[in-house]
């Protein structure tokens, strides 16, 4: 087998690359680049569709990472950070600080890459009958008032966008659900911005440890997508994975 490395766009220190995999089920599965543990995890799914989706996502992730760090996909070794996030091990400069994160929702999968810690989340925007009850469990009073004053379509959009802001903060910091108490303040800032109905594609938030930068980067109107990273990041660039990335044809656009 010939090992192929993607020629990917350069990942600058002040950028996040956001890769969109719109329909994983339509992609080929190449288990030859998966580890024994990954194959075991794929085989543990009770539904073939779930096993196939997992295999495709891991294969695409490996190929994208291989393209960035110039290491054959089969040879990549994964580990965990101090906060339990997935990471690559054994890398030399300048890739020692490469961070990546993954998010899934229905038929969309996202991969985010940056030279600093990064979190990504995606949620489908839809109306939930119990949305009002859910909000009272985690939102601030000002956010609840903001949501209740909005019309039904706008309320659903703000609800899921504020939720993704919480999620990406938790994912970037590695704190999980423990971060949601602090994240109340984040969502409050975001909700206030949405309420003003003005362009608001990013904002910064300082917690007890550092300053975090948030981006709203929804690729489609029916999805809410957010990124959380460091303040040295000035922008994100999105790409769509067109086909299984180990082919010799262009795999991005």
How does the language model describe each region?
Residues 1-253:
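Core catalytic alpha/beta fold that binds nucleotide/phospho-ligands
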